[in-house]
Regions:
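Conserved SAM-binding loop
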Residues: 11, 97, 148-149
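N-terminal helical cap/lid subdomain that shapes the substrate entry/recognition surface
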Residues: 1-81
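Short, acidic loop-to-helix structural element flanking the phosphoryl-transfer center
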Residues: 59, 70-99, 105-109, 129-133
């Protein structure tokens, strides 16, 4: 294994944090320009597109999302000593690490930082399958040597479609132990 791509969702309940942020944006910025959070698409990519369309160039909803994440992330996510130890062990073995998020990238950067992973995560990409492919290319490892860590069915399908191996988050420690130390 030469590279690991961590799904943001494998790091914790980021969907709950994102939903809370969208509800906050609708309450706060919806007073400036009406926004019905319940009318937004169910999937995160759809929500991002709808929010961009709604805001246009008039409203900085992404800035408000960043502020919400920074203020509320401790209520939703806690750093994991086990995860951090596994990632350090992988890095010590020369494995390159990236993080893939459904988006937006600004939020993923806050998640990675809050969980204490900033030094170990070399690259972050947000979006669908194209983001995973971009991230795998940026990490420079062949598909056969790249593992996507996730538990989400849709993300497992994306990884399989790109020829990438997959692992569940609780298997990360085992992967670190199995990876050979570079000579």
């Amino acid at each position: 294994m030469q590279a690991v791509i961590l799904s943001e969702r494998a790091l914790g309940d980021t969907d709950g944090l994102f939903a809370a942020a969208v509800a906050h944006i609708a309450r706060k910025l919806g007073r400036v320009k009406p926004l019905d959070a319940d009318a937004l698409p169910a999937d995160r990519a759809g929500k991002l597109h709808a929010l961009d369309e709604w805001a246009g160039s008039d409203i900085d909803w992404r800035g408000e999302l960043v502020r919400f994440y920074e203020d509320h992330i401790p209520l939703h996510l806690r750093p994991s000593p086990g995860l951090n130890a596994a990632l350090r062990a992988l890095q010590a073995r020369g494995v390159r690490i990236g993080c893939w998020s459904a988006g937006p990238e600004e939020a993923a950067r806050i998640v990675v930082h809050h969980l204490g992973l900033s030094r170990g995560v070399e690259a972050i990409a947000a979006g669908g399958g194209e983001a995973v492919a971009q991230l795998a290319a940026e990490l420079g490892a062949p598909a056969a040597e790249t593992v996507v860590v996730t538990r989400e069915e849709g993300e497992l399908a994306v990884a399989a479609g790109l020829g990438l191996a997959t692992a569940a988050p609780d298997e990360l420690g085992g992967l670190a132990a199995e990876t050979a130390v570079p000579q």
